[in-house]
């Protein structure tokens, strides 16, 4: 790919880089500057701007372009404003400089996840408005905080508020992932995050003795049971070339805690696990399996949830569904190859789907390595600009979906 010099940079790219320079990095994001940036975008685009504080210091910004038929449900274009932490020593360039190299690659935290999509929404609406378009359905763009740490002070609270109900959303778009091939990945569901702490209690004593019924022995049994399950799921994924990672349940041991000294057998030890539960799993049965593994290890072994999501929904991806037909039809007109998948991690889409609103996760980045959360996260400006073109067509198609049963 080639790129133009800085004197002829596309205005959409300049805006993208400006947004990337706002340091909304966890654990102390500069949300205030992001909101100010979005307020200015609303003013320039002639859109209404609503700010909803769902928790102290956590503001959701909603930009709205009214449709011509208020009886129809709206289109929700969702993105999050926060980004994950960085290890600057591993970056070729300052991750908050939005440096663009001679080939056109823009290096910045958030370049893929997901400030690119936020600006693509805004630029798609700007283009459609400047061309004089009006659509039957209202378009809301929501910019939410806290997604990278679970969304508990963001979308999870927002969907329960009257301001969200007032948006009357009928369909939503949210983030996806890059695809290194020619195809574009679209996500219609996602795995449920279960963060679990297993605690084992046993007999303490001097470490020179063979003590029976120790916390470590019993915790070891649970760890073995869970890792055996992990291996079974890993082999199931590897054995079936048609399965994607999001279709199986993953688990990783992420933390071990316990002990006070080298020569003291601890009375308590714990292990933390990050499960990502596939949407077709029987949640109640799986929780009973966890209980069984703890019981089999012996007395005094329990588990608790640090995070538990149990309402996975799947957005239809067949042509009888009007939303999918509009989305996939627009992609077909652009000769885009779609690969529908289950998102392997978690996004704010899970909260949107849980309240009955179909949602697709889509970040238009093909021929691009997946670099979210990675060192040297980057996106080529040509890929970004094509994404603006793609979202312009998608927004127009979705906002033009005719009235559905019950809407008029």
Curated annotation (Swiss-Prot):
The N-terminus is blocked. One of its GO terms (cellular component) is extracellular exosome. It is found in: Cytoplasm. It is an enzyme of class 3 (hydrolase). The keyword Amino-acid biosynthesis does not apply. Zn(2+) 2 binds at residues 113, 148, 373. Its cofactor is Zn(2+). Keywords: Cytoplasm, Hydrolase, Metal-binding, Phosphoprotein, Zinc. The keyword Cell cycle does not apply. Binds 2 Zn(2+) ions per subunit. Disulfide bonds: none annotated. It catalyses: an N-acyl-L-amino acid + H2O = an L-alpha-amino acid + a carboxylate; an N-acetyl-L-cysteine-S-conjugate + H2O = an S-substituted L-cysteine + acetate. Its EC number is 3.5.1.14. GO terms for molecular function: aminoacylase activity; identical protein binding; metal ion binding. The modification Phosphoserine is found at residue 408. Zn(2+) 1 binds at residues 80, 113, 175. InterPro entries: Aminoacylase-1_M20A (IPR052083), ArgE/DapE_CS (IPR001261), Bact_exopeptidase_dim_dom (IPR036264), N-acyl_aa_amidohydrolase (IPR010159), Peptidase_M20 (IPR002933), Peptidase_M20_dimer (IPR011650). The active site is at 82, 147 (proton acceptor). Involved in the hydrolysis of N-acylated or N-acetylated amino acids (except L-aspartate). PANTHER family: AMINOACYLASE-1. Homodimer. Belongs to the peptidase M20A family. This is Aminoacylase-1A. It comes from Rattus norvegicus. The gene is Acy1a.
